[in-house]
Amino acid sequence: MIKLEKISKIFDVSGKKLTALDNVSLHVPKGQICGVIGASGAGKSTLIRCVNLLETPSSGAVIVDGKDLTQLKNADLVHERRHIGMIFQHFNLLTSRTVFGNIALPLELENTPKEKIHQKVNELLALVGLTDKKDAYPSNLSGGQKQRVAIARALASEPKVLLCDEATSALDPATTQSILTLLKEINRTLGITILLITHEMEVVKRICDHVAVIDKGRLIEQGSVSEIFSNPQTQLAKEFIRSTFHISLPEEYMEKLTETPRNATSWPIVKFEFTGRTVDAPVLSQASKMFGVDLSILTSQIDYAGGVKFGFVIAEMEGDDEAITRTKTYLMEHNVKVEVLGYV
């Protein structure tokens, strides 16, 4: 449905060339949700704005529903843009219009008959759960309600594609989850292809089928969510995945933790990282029995993304040096990532 082929975007800033996108290629199949994740300034917003040509690429092709938008005349481009909805971080609602009026605006601009406008807007109000707010003004809405209005407005022209530019960044965690649930439901019931950009891996984990990691204007890694979470190839992808975990040592251990053993009875505190099949395999207990090492689990967290389990365990290892070394080697050979955090 969306194909970006070797897209580059170069800005002229005070006489200097600034490359925002560098030879980016991305394919989002029909009906899928794709998330592009990256840090601030990585090129995310420029990329998504190239999809509907709010930013014109310096080179490359932007193919949406089989048509290269970069090759269309203005009138044809305007027509194709009606099939591409977009929502933003800051909602962009008209304060002088009611909820109903904001959603109706795209239909009015297309000279849609009033009767059809009323029918369509009421359907969209029901879809986003705002039927009782149709006569309210944006100033009387919460952030989540404003974003629901923006989503309904973006759907008014019955788009095939929905672009989401940091759509949940200005929302609190609970509201973010409700908006993500709504987007997932829209994707499932209407079959709309969704491309979203975010700096939060939690968003990708929650609703995406496919993920691409962008850094300094280049896509450095992409694949299904299950592939990336189970076997990330780049350091940046690994850091984003770790950011979804909120795991730390108990305070009493943090106070005693040292970089090197203090004495013969100082034991290592080790973090084990599991992905994919290793989560279900009893490798920790197997290694403990095999090498005679006692493992005292201090904290852990297991989660899912793209149908794949992943997680962390932090444990204290007690045993002689050789047994501990053999245990760590065994676990690494079984695709468990091992990191010594310190000694207590």
Swiss-Prot record:
Record GO terms (molecular function): ABC-type D-methionine transporter activity; ATP binding; ATP hydrolysis activity
A GO CC term attached to the entry: plasma membrane
Highest taxon, organism lineage: Bacteria
Subcellular location: Cell inner membrane
Pfam families tied to this protein: ABC_tran, NIL
S-S pairs: none
Top-tier EC class: translocase
UniProt: ATP binding residues: G38, A39, S40, G41, A42, G43, K44, S45
EC id: 7.4.2.11
Keyword Ribosomal protein set for record: no
Catalytic function, reaction form: L-methionine(out) + ATP + H2O = L-methionine(in) + ADP + phosphate + H(+); D-methionine(out) + ATP + H2O = D-methionine(in) + ADP + phosphate + H(+)
Assembly and binders: The complex is composed of two ATP-binding proteins (MetN), two transmembrane proteins (MetI) and a solute-binding protein (MetQ).
NCBIfam families named among the record's database cross-references: ABC_MetN
PANTHER family: AMINO ACID IMPORT ATP-BINDING PROTEIN, METHIONINE IMPORT ATP-BINDING PROTEIN METN
Annotated function: Part of the ABC transporter complex MetNIQ involved in methionine import. Responsible for energy coupling to the transport system.
Record protein name field: Methionine import ATP-binding protein MetN
Organism: Pasteurella multocida (strain Pm70)
Species classification: Bacteria, Pseudomonadati, Pseudomonadota, Gammaproteobacteria, Pasteurellales
